[in-house]
C-alpha cells in the first residue's frame, strides 16, 4: 500500500455548505420509520413510478458506439424532442462557489416546465436562458469535456425547487455533476428513498485491479456516493457505486475500469432508458 490511510484520507472532497452540514447532522432522522413515511407522503404523493433518474457514465464508449460516448446519444435524443430548452448555471456550483469546474456548464432543462421557468428566480441565484438545440448539444459536449458526470432526471423535487409543479410531467433535465459540489452527495446520509431513483446504468460495472492498486486513496476523494470501501489496503466498489466514472478518471495507476456486461445489448439498454422516461414525461412543449 502506498501509505497508511486515515479516515481523513478516505473522505470525499464534497461541498461543506449549510445544506450539506444539515444533511450530515440530521440525515439519520429520515431513516426513522415514522419520519420516513411522512417524507414519502410529502415528497412523493403520487408514488415513485412517475419519477426517474439515471446516472450516465462519463465518456463511456462501448459496442457500436466506440466513436460516440453513450451519454451524448441519449442527450441528443431528448434534446431533439424538446419543444423548449433552457440552459441554467449549476445551482450546486454557484452556491458552493466552485473553483474546480465552470458554473455555466449546468443543467439543460426541457419541456413546457422549462418554458414556464422564472429566469429571474432560479434556485441558488443561478442564471438561465432559452437555448437552441444546437446550443444545448454544444453545452453537453463541453460539460463532458470538463469532466462532469451527466445525469438524466424527471423528479418532483426539481419541479418544486424550480416552482413549476403544475408542469411536473412536462419537465426534465440533464444535469452535469462534479464531485466537489453536487447536492446529491447528501443522499448517503438519508434513508433509502433518496437512492431509489439514482441508479447505475444497466450492464455497467466498475472494478479495481488489486495488482495495480497501490492504496493511494485518490479514488475515495472523488467518490461522493459512498461507492467505495477499503479491503486489505485496496479500494473495492460497493453496491452503492453508481458507475459515474469519477474514480476511473483520477486513478494514477489506471487500476480502475468501467466495464459493460458482454451479455448485455447496449442498444437495448439505451432504448430502455428512453422508454422509461418517455412513459412519464412529455417534453415536446
Cite the ranges covered by each PLM segment.
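General detector of N-terminal leader/presequence modules that precede the first folded domain
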Residues: 1-128
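Local cysteine-cluster metal-coordination motifs and their immediate loop/turn environment
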Residues: 86-102, 109, 172-185, 211-225, ...
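Compact structured core domains
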Residues: 126-159, 165-166, 172-181
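Residue-level detector of anion-binding/catalytic polar loops
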Residues: 149, 247, 257
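Ferredoxin-like iron-sulfur electron-transfer modules
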Residues: 156-173, 193-243, 257-267, 282-285
